[in-house]
Amino acid sequence: MNSPAPVGSPAPVSAPSLDVAGLAFAYPDGHQALFGVDFRVERGERVALLGPNGAGKTTLVLHLNGILTGGAGTVTVAGLPVGKRHMAQIRRKVGIVFQDPDDQLFMPTVREDVAFGPAAAGLTGAELEARVDRALDQVGMAEFKGRPPHHLSFGQRRRVAVATVLAMEPEILVLDEPSSNLDPASRRELADILRSLDVTVLMVTHDLPYALELCPRSLILSEGVIAADGRTGELLADDTLMRAHRLELPFGFDPRSVTMGA
């Protein structure tokens, strides 16, 4: 739990984008995936969630917008507890971009895919079109508005998938392996887009150089707990920590030689 502010200290300007406290969860078959996860992400931060397969990363992400509930502990998004009472608001505030963009693109055109969420939330007319146009502009896909998604490249489809989430104007953008299956040019384009967004980002990835490039801070989730929380470059340069949690950098990659961008 977070300690109360000392007497006489100024009140915080706003609640953090995400506050996870004591989160534990077991599946119905008895498998315990999370054992008490604690962390917070401030507004505007870009944070990488790292960890080996089976660490509990997917289980954690599915708690952030209430897809999974019922374990111990709490998840709070922009001051709202994740639960039935606030579920509609939470799902607008937490946008998840899945690893496979085809899981999110199912309408005949790019425009219809991006409009789907806001339209379901009640937007219509000029307000809806403005929301769609703004989201497509943010990912550099405005010129493809009338195209069928299946006619686009994989990298373009991933950018449209990001736009479908941005159209909901989320508090937090959660990305699951955003660099997977991208060629170098698409990888660079997506990185530039993510850096330009005025939104909190939580990036789940095994791509450690991409995490270093985009996220000043990283969390290592291992065996259902946060094993480390710190500056990405410092964590990746800690050989003992990396080995302990089965994380490996590409051959020849030295995080100490990389200058972090903003």
From Swiss-Prot:
Taxonomic placement: Bacteria, Bacillati, Actinomycetota, Actinomycetes, Kitasatosporales
Family to which the UniProt record says this protein belongs: Belongs to the ABC transporter superfamily.
UniProt main location, coarse: membrane
Keyword Translocase on entry: yes
Limits of the ABC transporter domain: 18-248
Annotated protein name in UniProt: Putative ABC transporter ATP-binding protein SAV_3608
Membrane topology: Peripheral membrane protein
Binding site for ATP: 51-58
Superkingdom of the source species: Bacteria
EC number of this enzyme: 7.-.-.-
GO MF term set: ATP binding; ATP hydrolysis activity; ATPase-coupled transmembrane transporter activity
Function description: Probably part of an ABC transporter complex. Responsible for energy coupling to the transport system.
